[in-house]
A protein has these predicted regions:
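Metal-associated gating/positioning segment near the N- to mid-region
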Residues: 1-4
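Short glycine/serine/threonine/alanine-rich loop segments
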Residues: 6, 96-98, 162-163
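A generic structural motif
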Residues: 6-7, 45
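Conserved, mostly hydrophobic/aromatic
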Residues: 8, 103
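Active-site mouth loops of central-metabolism enzymes
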Residues: 9-34, 75-77
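Active-site neighborhoods of metal-dependent hydrolases
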Residues: 29-90, 106-117, 123-221
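Short, surface-exposed connector motifs at secondary-structure boundaries
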Residues: 93-101, 127-128
């Protein structure tokens, strides 16, 4: 159904699909990667490309439960940094109006603001959009080694002219979290409220996790 006054459009999820990861791992030329990204956009009629936990969803299928920005995946031996770099370049060179839409690694992990900054650096100055950045802006100070690093993130992103971001606003109360980050949704399923959850691969190309959650002002995340 159409919702008046609301612009809508789909993002095609890349960065965990075997075809792209195989191209990157065997050193394919950027033009070949650009052709693949263009094909995906035409076939799906999406308005842009999104990468969720770059390489991490694919690594999860091979029993990796975490993948940092400069850590190689078990299967393809490539890093999230390289995935972000080649996708950001493809989107830019193809002239896609919306920059690469990035859900960073290590969502909700204490100290993850460092990997968020490294993910931004991976784009090497090309335009990117960091989504729900509040979940990627945590430090590890305090009695429980968990703190806000929003000041550090804000100071850094204000220096990057080609970077945009959104907060990912949370409202207190019952909700259902839905994410392509099956690695993180699997890790969080013990917090499900009520105690039901779903996690699956979608045609072995991306991930999906649905975890009901009740946000309160006492929640760390």
């Amino acid at each position: 159904a159409d919702t008046p006054f609301i612009d809508k459009g789909g993002y095609a999820l890349l960065g965990n699909d075997d075809f792209l990861l195989d191209l990157i791992s065997r050193g394919a030329h950027q033009s070949e990667i650009n052709d693949y990204v263009a094909f995906i956009l035409k076939a799906t009629q999406c308005i842009g490309i999104k990468v969720v936990n770059p390489g991490g969803i694919n690594a999860f299928k091979f029993n990796q439960r975490a993948l940092n920005v400069d850590e190689n995946s078990v299967r393809y031996k490539i890093t999230p940094r390289k995935i972000v770099r080649v996708l950001a370049r493809a989107v830019y060179e193809l002239g896609v109006p919306h920059p690469l839409h990035v859900h960073c690694s290590n969502l909700g992990v204490p100290g993850n603001f460092k990997s968020t900054i490294e993910t931004i650096k991976a784009a090497e100055g090309l335009p990117v959009h960091i989504t729900h950045i509040q979940f990627h802006s945590y430090g590890n100070n305090g009695d429980r080694n968990f703190s806000s690093a929003s000041a550090e993130i804000t100071e850094y992103i204000n220096k990057i002219p080609n970077l945009t971001c959104d907060v990912g606003q949370v409202l207190f109360g019952q909700t259902a979290t839905m994410s392509g980050d099956s690695m993180k949704q699997h890790a969080n399923h013990s917090h499900a409220h009520p105690d039901k959850w779903l996690c699956m691969d979608i045609e072995c190309e991306a991930g999906c996790g649905v975890v009901p959650f009740k946000y309160t002002d006492q929640s760390f995340v």
